[in-house]
Amino acid sequence: LTQQGREEGIRRLMSINLLKRLESSVYSFRLTVDRIRKLIDGTIQTINNYQSGGCVLNLTEISDDEDFDYDDQNTDLFSVGKKVKIDLADMDYVSWKRELEKDAENLELLSLMIADITPEHDTKLQTLFDLIRKKIEHPINPGNRKLLIFTAFSDTADYLYANVSKFAKEKFGLNTAEVTGVVEGKTTIPKLRADLNTVLTCFSPISKGKDILLPGSSAEIDILIGTDCISEGQN
């Protein structure tokens, strides 16, 4: 595998990752675009500093892992080449900077194109609201109002929880929870622990033995939003 082939592979991975994020939600796509833009801006600034005084470019200094969320860190897009030290004197940094500036302009254009897509104008989110409404008003099984919403990205889960929980509570008085395995979960039930086991118990009280694990608790979760962490260790 040549260096040129490796770099072409990285470019393709970047494109695929962006498309996956866009397919998931415009919110996740926007976050990733902003993170890449931040990385590029940091690199351009490092080149400017070198032109002013000279230094060694350390990619680990340009972007710390905390700059990216858990989803982004688990893609090859952000794991290739970050630990390599590069002496700018050994490369055509002028051309590199020019290409980075073009990338920054394109990313800025993408940000502007999606800036007006608020939750109210997010067709995919509004379609989900319609599906929830139909499920609640016309359940397959009488009285069954349970909904399980899966997503590949924790950013999308956050976005869905922020909007679905409000919609479900205001329209139908239903409680919503979110679990992603990255941070502590969330729920609209006051004072309820939002760890995975508690959330699953309140979402599926019969199969999880809620009457034994949480005796006297009337809390019940109707809508659960999460990533594949929900299925870990579950039958």
Explain the meaning of each model-derived region.
Residues L1-A194, L214, E220-E232:
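Helicase motor interdomain insertion/brace
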Residues P190-P215:
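Surface-exposed acidic, glycine/proline-enriched linker/cap segments
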